[in-house]
């Protein structure tokens, strides 16, 4: 009976925490407290493949828009691993439109030097110079990309982190340009949101974005634009993955 009672208390606490957070649109510190540029600033989200923006960065994109930042997106490949590049470009534009990013602020590199291939190591210096060009062209105040583990461990994701890290450590970023990296978490935290929630809220945070239920529906709608990628396991991903509703990020 004691075990049952403890389980009931645990479930009640988790449910309370879930409901407390779920429909709050302000689950992060002020931009100034977090070290972020304020309203009117320009953010550049740097991804490797079409669908990264919906699978991983939707909470950040919607959260930055909520903070009145102008969000642009730089995608390094067309996702042509299965010769679907042209289809995936169109899907990316549709997804970005759902997330509030117009086509004029979506840049797709799609060069042979940056193939969608986990077996190919992108050249860090080349990636870095390309990112820097777009930072200058867009007068960027904030760069957002993957962390050292790339969330899923994909080498193309990690290549982006290495490039941005090189720019940051080398002092090549424009003055006042900040960098946020998306925190990778273990499989249990990634797919069991109720268990992850208390850990996320109690852990030291750089920046935390938690979507409202309405925004989660928006993120799922963006993901549904990637029809060529919606295999059965990705449907499960949209239901269970924390990255459809929560992003925790760290400043470099």
Curated annotation (Swiss-Prot):
Please give, as recorded in its UniProt entry, the membrane topology of this protein.
Single-pass type I membrane protein
Residue numbers on the Cytoplasmic membrane side: 23-252
Residue spans crossing the bilayer? 2-22
The answer to keyword Transmembrane applying to this record is yes
* Sample GO molecular function, one term: N-acetylglucosaminylphosphatidylinositol deacetylase activity
| Reactions catalysed | a 6-(N-acetyl-alpha-D-glucosaminyl)-1-(1,2-diacyl-sn-glycero-3-phospho)-1D-myo-inositol + H2O = a 6-(alpha-D-glucosaminyl)-1-(1,2-diacyl-sn-glycero-3-phospho)-1D-myo-inositol + acetate
Tell me the pathway. Glycolipid biosynthesis; glycosylphosphatidylinositol-anchor biosynthesis
Q: Which BP terms does GO give this entry? A: GPI anchor biosynthetic process
| Enzyme Commission identifier(s) | 3.5.1.89
Which keywords, in A-to-Z order, does the entry hold?
Endoplasmic reticulum, GPI-anchor biosynthesis, Hydrolase, Lipid metabolism, Membrane, Transmembrane, Transmembrane helix
Per UniProt, subcellular location reads as: Endoplasmic reticulum membrane
The name this protein carries in UniProt is N-acetylglucosaminyl-phosphatidylinositol de-N-acetylase
């Amino acid at each position: 009976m004691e075990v049952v009672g403890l389980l009931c208390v645990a479930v009640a606490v988790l449910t309370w925490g879930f409901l407390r957070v779920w429909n709050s649109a302000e689950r992060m510190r002020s931009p100034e407290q977090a070290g972020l540029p304020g309203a009117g600033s320009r953010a550049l989200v740097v991804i490797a493949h079409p669908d990264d923006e919906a699978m991983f960065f939707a909470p950040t994109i919607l959260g930055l828009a909520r903070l009145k930042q102008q969000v642009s997106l730089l995608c390094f490949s067309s996702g042509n691993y299965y010769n679907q590049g042209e289809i995936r470009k169109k899907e990316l534009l549709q997804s970005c439109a759902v997330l509030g990013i117009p086509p004029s602020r979506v840049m797709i590199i799609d060069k042979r030097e940056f193939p969608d291939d986990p077996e190919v190591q992108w050249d860090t210096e080349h990636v870095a110079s390309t990112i820097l060009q777009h930072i200058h062209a867009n007068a960027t105040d904030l760069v957002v990309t993957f962390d050292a583990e790339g969330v899923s461990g994909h080498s193309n994701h990690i290549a982006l982190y290495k490039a941005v890290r090189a720019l940051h450590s080398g002092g090549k970023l424009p003055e006042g340009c900040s960098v946020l990296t998306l925190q990778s978490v273990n499989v249990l935290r990634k797919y069991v949101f109720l268990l992850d929630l208390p850990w996320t809220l109690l852990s030291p945070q750089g920046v935390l974005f938690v979507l409202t239920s309405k925004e989660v529906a928006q993120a799922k709608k963006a993901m549904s634009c990637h029809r060529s990628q919606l295999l059965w396991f990705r449907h499960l991903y949209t239901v269970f993955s924390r990255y459809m509703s929560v992003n925790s990020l760290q400043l470099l």
